[in-house]
Swiss-Prot record:
<dbReference type="GO" id="GO:0006355">
    <property type="term" value="P:regulation of DNA-templated transcription"/>
</dbReference>
<feature type="modified residue" description="Phosphoserine">
    <location>
        <position position="92"/>
    </location>
</feature>
<feature type="modified residue" description="Phosphoserine">
    <location>
        <position position="103"/>
    </location>
</feature>
<dbReference type="InterPro" id="IPR019139">
    <property type="entry name" value="LRRFIP1/2"/>
</dbReference>
<keyword id="KW-0175">Coiled coil</keyword>
<comment type="function">
    <text>May function as activator of the canonical Wnt signaling pathway, in association with DVL3, upstream of CTNNB1/beta-catenin. Positively regulates Toll-like receptor (TLR) signaling in response to agonist probably by competing with the negative FLII regulator for MYD88-binding.</text>
</comment>
<feature type="modified residue" description="Phosphoserine">
    <location>
        <position position="111"/>
    </location>
</feature>
<feature type="region of interest" description="Disordered">
    <location>
        <begin position="52"/>
        <end position="130"/>
    </location>
</feature>
<feature type="compositionally biased region" description="Basic and acidic residues">
    <location>
        <begin position="73"/>
        <end position="83"/>
    </location>
</feature>
<feature type="coiled-coil region">
    <location>
        <begin position="260"/>
        <end position="408"/>
    </location>
</feature>
<feature type="modified residue" description="Phosphoserine">
    <location>
        <position position="95"/>
    </location>
</feature>
<comment type="similarity">
    <text>Belongs to the LRRFIP family.</text>
</comment>
<dbReference type="GO" id="GO:0016055">
    <property type="term" value="P:Wnt signaling pathway"/>
</dbReference>
<protein>
    <recommendedName>
        <fullName>Leucine-rich repeat flightless-interacting protein 2</fullName>
    </recommendedName>
</protein>
<feature type="modified residue" description="Phosphoserine">
    <location>
        <position position="116"/>
    </location>
</feature>
<dbReference type="GO" id="GO:0035660">
    <property type="term" value="P:MyD88-dependent toll-like receptor 4 signaling pathway"/>
</dbReference>
<keyword id="KW-0597">Phosphoprotein</keyword>
Length: 415
């Protein structure tokens, strides 16, 4: 008694999705390689920027020192020139007044000019003080300029670092989204497998229903058997049943309680006993026939006795023949019932084993799919939490970047 679709083997869903999984793994490997190359390029660019910043700082310090030395040299030259002019100008004017006679007004003006340039030490000290003040201001300006330049370079470096961090966060976000899509696809595949298994289970249930209908239609009786082959197991066998006719069920009930194999062995023993009795009766019949053939040659005076013994023998022979015919009928009926029972047992055992194996496989696959579904749901929740955390980190970094840009613009405005 077969059921629809009981002997077919379906192609596993895993083999159908192997090409897609391989393509996804290749894409993931290529993305990881590109990510590693980008990271290496960013590290190299960061090193180059650091070296460039160090070079610019060194050049700025050297330019500051050169400008400072140049300014001090120019100020020294200017002070020396003024000092020389202060000492050469009065002597020339005195010689001119001695050689050429001038009026009193010119002599008074010349005396006033010389009196204004008489103190060269005072003017030189004032120039040196002003020079020192200018140098101090210049030094302070250069130091503040260098500090601002360093702060500017540091801010630029921090901005570049934050840009790299944001790029990495975006790449991680993209990777998380890709993993989420892969997990979603895997979840869809698992759902498809669940639907396929549910369809198989429905088919098995339909087959069981048809089996029950056929059993009821043909008037069969289901006999449970928990210990097949007379073996004693620690764990009971689930679903071991046998469908037989009502006559066979009555015969099995007459055999007593116990497993089906034990009752069949009892019936086989009774059959052997009946066969042995039939053989004994046949031997007795042959002996009686031989006795009859020997008694046929006896004298006529014993005819009355022989007739009486013949009547008794005929009655015995009739009884024996009747018993033999009854035993033969019972034997043939028992043989037919046993053959029918054996065929039903073998057929139903095969069906039960198939149904049991299919049900166990379906239960195992269902449990595995449920566990995989729970695992995927946990991973999905973890990925969503990570995505939310990365979004919060990204927004925080964006706020910090805006704040640093505002500080930078404020510093540039102050300069």
């Amino acid at each position: 008694m077969g059921t629809p679709g009981s002997g077919r083997k379906r192609t596993p869903v895993k083999d159908r999705f192997s090409a897609e999984d391989e393509a996804l793994s290749n894409i993931a490997r290529e993305a990881e390689a590109r990510l590693a190359a980008k990271r290496a390029a960013r590290a190299e660019a960061r090193d180059i920027r650091m070296r460039e910043l160090e070079r610019q700082q060194r050049e700025g310090v050297e330019d500051t020192l050169s400008l400072r030395s140049l300014g001090s040299h120019r100020l020294d030259e200017k002070s020396d020139k003024q000092y020389a002019e202060n000492y050469t100008r009065p002597s020339s004017r005195n010689s001119a007044s001695a050689t050429t006679p001038l009026s009193g007004q010119s002599s008074r003006r010349g005396s006033g000019d010389t009196s204004s340039l008489i103190d060269p030490d005072t003017s030189l000290s004032e120039l040196r003080e002003s020079l020192s003040e200018v140098e101090e201001k210049y030094k302070k300006a250069m130091v503040s300029n260098a500090q601002l330049d360093n702060e500017k370079n540091n801010l630029i470096y921090q901005v570049d670092t934050l840009k790299d961090v944001i790029e990495e966060q975006e790449e991680q976000m993209a990777e998380f989204y890709r993993e989420n899509e892969e997990k979603s696809k895997e979840l869809e595949r698992q759902k498809h497998m669940c639907s396929v298994l549910q369809h198989k289970m429905d088919e098995l249930k339909e087959g069981l229903r048809q089996r029950d209908e056929l059993i009821e239609k043909h008037g069969l009786v289901i006999i449970p058997d928990s210990t097949p082959n007379g073996d004693v197991h620690h764990e009971p066998v689930v679903g071991a049943i046998t469908a037989v006719s009502q006559e066979a069920a009555q015969v099995l009930e007459s055999a007593g309680e116990g497993p089906l194999d034990v009752r069949l062995r009892k019936l086989a023993g009774e059959k052997d006993e009946l066969l042995s009795q039939i053989r004994k009766l046949k031997l007795q019949l042959e002996e009686e026939r031989q006795k009859c053939s020997r008694n046929d040659g006896m004298s006529g005076d014993l005819a009355g006795l022989q007739n009486g013994s013949d009547l008794q023998f005929i009655e015995m022979q009739r009884d024996a023949n009747r018993q033999i015919s009854e035993y033969k009928f019972k034997l043939s009926k028992a043989e037919q019932d046993i053959a029918t029972l054996e065929q039903s047992i073998s057929r139903l055992e095969g069906q039960v084993l198939r149904y049991k194996t299919a049900a166990e496989n379906a239960e195992k696959i269902e449990d595995e799919l449920k566990a995989e579904r729970r695992k995927l749901q946990r991973e999905l929740r973890t990925a969503q939490d990570k995505i939310e955390e990365m979004e919060m980190t990204n927004s925080h970094l964006a706020k910090r970047l805006e704040k640093m840009k505002a500080n930078r613009t404020a510093l540039l405005a102050q300069q």
